Amino acid sequence: MMQNIHFIGIGGIGISALARFLREKGFKISGSDLKESKITKELEKEGVKVSIPHHKDNILNKDLVIYSAAIKEENPEFKYAKELGIKCLSRKEALPLILEDKRVFAVAGAHGKSTTSSILASLLDDASVIIGAILKEFGSNMIYKESQNLVFEADESDSSFLNSNPYLAIVTNAEAEHLDHYGNEVSKLHHAYTQFLDVAKIRVINAEDEFLKNYKNESIKLYPSKDIKNCTMCIENFKPFTSFELKDLGEFKVFGMGYHLALDASLAILAALNFLDIETIRTRLKNYQGIKKRFDILHADENLVLIDDYGHHPTEIKATLSAAQEYVKLGGYKKITAIFEPHRYTRLATNLKEFAKAFEGVDELVILPVYAAGEEPIELDLKAVFPKALFVEDIKREGKFLVASKGQVFEEGLIIGFGAGDISNKLRQKNE
């Protein structure tokens, strides 16, 4: 009987959710990571034994090892587990084991999947949840319920979504991201999305996506440009809300700001309609409080709003900045300052022009060094692409303000940080 499960790279947002879920299911969980983080500290408080850094002895007496995508073959724990003949599964390979007895509601897509799955989790409040973001109403990326139903954020970046065996599948969009995993062939990525949808009994898709609009099998289709009407935004006590009408179902109000919020919520509503009546959905939508690092307001007063956002692709940044412009207009703020920590050299190099375009509407742009995420550096002339940007080595939080390494102080207007790397910590760490 497999009882003792060890996670290598347990501090990752996706893998920590799996560890939490299996612990609730009754397994004895341990894990390790390179360095301590907020997640590893929380796991320890929850009773998980976490070892820092990796050491081969950490896997002694384990029945199964699950490792994150960041783990290389030369990792001492991975190597030793192989030598000892302990079964080792990648996160992707472990999914069938984790999801085996569940009715899975899986959400995939290049953008909006965390938001869509977390809104769906608020609507289907009897379901367990495993997502790659922290749900603010629960303070965790995992919710365990004694239920057959499970809302799961499915990842296309490593094709692991094909192991999620969805009962219901939502695809928000099929824009080409993570193409390196698919041999840089868009057709392979699209084929994977088709496979993912084909398995499901119920399918909900954004039918205005260039690829999804040609999907042949039966599905519930959202045509955003005609199905979503009267989309308006408002601020209540500095909190952002978006109201919209969906098809002939009446008005809905969701926490967050921007048309993309209405789109994500609409997909979740159309999925939930298979299980709930419309008034229950309308009411439960009000429970949704957003997710950490998605238009996440860290400080707000009449003069200054400081926001942390995970956006690291031009499409996401553009959508979020359009929401920021709306917030500034409604709140009467002076200007928008964007602080950008590029994530991965390959993504930056591939989308340079699009990034430049995405930031066109801001009053000030501050650019931090690239967060490499283990990649080799690529020589790029960023100063030529962003001629008006201020390039700084670092930025830190002092009280409610931000101070750059060159001494500049950012203290008014709407300041928004973008990135999937370290920027979140920089924006949150107050130097008392």
Curated annotation (Swiss-Prot):
Binding site for ATP: G109, A110, H111, G112, K113, S114, T115
Signal peptide range: none
An MF annotation (GO) of this entry: UDP-N-acetylmuramate-L-alanine ligase activity
Entry keyword set: ATP-binding, Cell cycle, Cell division, Cell shape, Cell wall biogenesis/degradation, Cytoplasm, Ligase, Nucleotide-binding, Peptidoglycan synthesis
Family: Belongs to the MurCDEF family.
PANTHER family named in the record: UDP-N-ACETYLMURAMATE--L-ALANINE LIGASE (PTHR43445:SF3), UDP-N-ACETYLMURAMATE--L-ALANINE LIGASE-RELATED (PTHR43445)
Functional description taken from the UniProt entry: Cell wall formation.
Protein name: UDP-N-acetylmuramate--L-alanine ligase
